[in-house]
């Protein structure tokens, strides 16, 4: 895995965004000019995005809670009946407080927030956290989506350390979706994964993540896994909910009540 700050540059997509690009470069401690960079953090009219560079590179990755996939899932995603809702314990009169300790681009957290859950998100990779921060800021300006992202609070840093040092009321549910070691050689791997993997690597500390989550959550821990992946080393889940490509392993501690 590349170290943060190597092979990545920041660039403005047009002159009017030069000041914003310079501010992000300073904050992320990345150069504005690096001809040998493998990735570019780009600032433009659509906000912040990461673009892998090179002839075979997929399109840019950005966070958009207002349009596209997030909007479609919000309108047609199945509401309280979808598997993630059942996994975290959403039921009539029950909207648990959820900590998503592996936030990524915030897609799952947004779904849960749209169903009424108060969400705290932790993202450890600074570039992905920056995309998330930018996407949340743009979404707050939208009349419909602003109320949803108002239920999403972003923290950055190492989730294990943050959970171990947690102060205040613990989250009722902790949701984990660790990056699973990659075995799919097909060309159809999602562009997010193609961009993320060199930046993030695999979550080899998943057992420690689970251990910290089980120590902190007051009611349950939910782990999302590829359907055929082994469970995380450690305590066994009580049961699982299985979909076409994913599985939710449930580790209950206490019943969620209305």
Swiss-Prot record:
Reaction(s) this enzyme catalyzes, per UniProt: guanosine(1516) in 16S rRNA + S-adenosyl-L-methionine = N(2)-methylguanosine(1516) in 16S rRNA + S-adenosyl-L-homocysteine + H(+)
Protein family (similarity comment): Belongs to the methyltransferase superfamily. RsmJ family.
Keyword Zinc (UniProt): no
Described purpose of this protein according to its UniProt entry: Specifically methylates the guanosine in position 1516 of 16S rRNA.
Record: residues binding S-adenosyl-L-methionine: 123-124, 177
The protein's name: Ribosomal RNA small subunit methyltransferase J
Protein's UniProt keywords contain Cytoplasm: yes
InterPro entries per the UniProt record, alphabetical: 16SrRNA_methylTrfase_J (IPR007536), SAM-dependent_MTases_sf (IPR029063)
UniProt cross-references to HAMAP family, sorted A to Z: 16SrRNA_methyltr_J (MF_01523)
Ranges of biased composition (kind: Basic and acidic residues): 239-252
EC number: 2.1.1.242
Ranges where the record places region Disordered: 232-258
Protein source organism: Pseudomonas putida (strain GB-1)
Cleavable signal peptide: none
Lineage of the organism: Bacteria, Pseudomonadati, Pseudomonadota, Gammaproteobacteria, Pseudomonadales
Cysteine disulfide links: none
Chief location bin: cytoplasm
MF terms in GO: rRNA (guanine-N2-)-methyltransferase activity
Keyword terms: Cytoplasm, Methyltransferase, rRNA processing, S-adenosyl-L-methionine, Transferase
Localization (cell): Cytoplasm
A GO cellular component entry from the record: cytoplasm
């Amino acid at each position: 895995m590349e170290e943060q700050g190597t092979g990545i540059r920041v660039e403005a997509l047009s002159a009017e965004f030069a000041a914003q690009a310079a501010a992000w470069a300073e904050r992320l401690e990345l150069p504005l000019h690096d001809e040998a960079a493998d990735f570019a953090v780009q600032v433009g009219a659509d906000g912040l995005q990461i673009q892998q560079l090179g002839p075979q590179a997929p399109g840019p990755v950005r966070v958009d809670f207002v349009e596209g996939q997030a909007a479609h899932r919000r309108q047609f995603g199945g509401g309280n009946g979808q598997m993630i809702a059942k996994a975290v314990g959403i039921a009539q009169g029950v909207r648990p407080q959820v900590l998503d300790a592996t936030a990524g681009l915030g897609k799952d957290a947004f779904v849960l927030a749209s169903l009424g859950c108060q969400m705290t998100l932790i993202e450890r990779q600074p570039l992905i956290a920056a995309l998330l921060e930018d996407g949340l800021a743009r979404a707050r300006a939208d009349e419909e989506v602003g109320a949803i992202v108002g239920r999403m609070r972003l923290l950055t840093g190492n989730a294990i350390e943050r959970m171990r040092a947690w102060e205040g009321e613990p989250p009722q549910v902790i949701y984990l979706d660790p990056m699973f070691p990659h075995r799919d050689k097909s060309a159809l791997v999602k562009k997010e994964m193609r961009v993320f993997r060199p930046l993030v690597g695999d979550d080899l500390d998943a057992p420690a993540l689970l251990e910290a989550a089980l120590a902190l959550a007051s009611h349950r821990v939910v782990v999302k896994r590829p359907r055929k992946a082994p469970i995380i080393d450690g305590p066994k889940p009580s049961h699982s909910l299985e979909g076409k490509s994913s599985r939710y392993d449930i580790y209950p501690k206490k019943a969620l009540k209305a």
